[in-house]
Amino acid sequence: MGALPEKEWVPKAPSLRRKLGIMAKVQDEMGHGQLLLRVVEDLMKPYGKTRGDLMDDLFTGRLKFHNVFHMPTRSWADAGMIGWLVDGAAIITQTNMLGASYGPYARALQRICAEEVFHAQHGESIIMALAEGTPEQRAMIQESLDEWWESLLMFFGPASKETTGTS
């Protein structure tokens, strides 16, 4: 699902180098989805569910994923902020699961976490380039941070036990 917010920026990236970088990241994120889908498929077998059932649940809204994957990316700074801070938060939460007792999940996370480090570095590079740019580019960074901050914090859990995914 990590590819959803950034895929729009593949054709809009400001340079060929940036286009290749974001394209590689989106491709990695699609691979992460495939790895995790295989793990989920295996866990669903005892319940008689298939990949098709899972996809139907996703498309109809019965099954959801983290709210950041539903947010639009309005600017190039958003693409950078996702890589730098959202993928950075994912690294923190996912590395805590590297020792999971379920082997297929632990193995998938090893690859995912290794690749997420590159994604965070890529995002940081975008943000640093914008920070060294014009006042408008720096304002774009601030707007992006303001937009993504609250959803980013949800990677670490809700603010209180009264907070839910629909709050």
Regions found by a protein language model. Name each.
Residues 17-20, 42-49, 134-135:
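Short, glycine/acidic-rich hinge or "gate" loops at secondary-structure transitions
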Residues 3, 7, 30, 34-37, ...:
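Structural signal for well-ordered, non-membrane alpha-helices
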Residues 67-122:
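Internal, conserved structured core segments that host functional sites
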Residues 2-24, 90-105:
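Helix-loop segments that flank and shape redox-cofactor active sites
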Residues 55-83, 100, 133-137, 148-166:
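Acidic/His metal-coordination segments adjacent to aromatic residues that form catalytic metal sites
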Residues 104-166:
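A contiguous pocket-lining binding segment that forms or flanks enzyme active sites
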Residues 25-57, 123-128:
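Conserved alpha-helical segments that form or flank metal/cofactor-binding pockets of metalloenzymes
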Residues 6-7, 20, 28, 37, ...:
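His/Met- and acidic-residue-enriched segments that coordinate or traffic transition-metal cofactors
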